[in-house]
From Swiss-Prot:
GO MF terms held by the record: 4 iron, 4 sulfur cluster binding; electron transfer activity; metal ion binding; oxidoreductase activity
4Fe-4S ferredoxin-type domain segment(s): 2-31, 39-68
Membrane topology: Peripheral membrane protein
GO cellular component entries: chloroplast thylakoid membrane; photosystem I
Cofactor(s) needed: [4Fe-4S] cluster
An example Gene Ontology biological process: photosynthetic electron transport in photosystem I
Species, as recorded: Pinus thunbergii
Pfam annotation, one family: Fer4_21
Protein's name in the database: Photosystem I iron-sulfur center
Binding site for [4Fe-4S] cluster 1: C11, C14, C17, C58
Alphabetically ordered keywords of this record: 4Fe-4S, Chloroplast, Electron transport, Iron, Iron-sulfur, Membrane, Metal-binding, Oxidoreductase, Photosynthesis, Photosystem I, Plastid, Repeat, Thylakoid, Transport
Top-level EC class as recorded in UniProt: oxidoreductase
């Protein structure tokens, strides 16, 4: 089952989540909205193992990157699983 990876605008562009991901789901892309001029992106969510290492690596108090496991996603959408 696929997991969902959400990057929030509290991302500070530090690259910690990208480096922590064992399956290379995340990458940095240019973004003018933060001091680092880059933000995390999740173009390969189909490869997400659901380990949440990216969440653990995030230094912000707001968890700028969140992994929603497949059962959390279907439950929040009101879908059967």
């Amino acid at each position: 089952m696929a997991h969902s990876v959400k990057i929030y605008d509290t991302c500070i562009g530090c690259t910690q989540c990208v480096r922590a991901c064992p399956t290379d789901v995340l990458e940095m892309i240019p973004w003018e909205g933060c001091k680092a001029k880059q933000i995390a992106s999740a173009p390969r969510t189909e490869d997400c193992a659901g380990c949440k290492r990216c969440e653990s690596a995030c230094p912000t108090d707001f968890l700028s990157v969140r992994v929603y496991l497949w059962h959390e996603t279907t439950r929040s959408m009101g879908l059967a699983y």
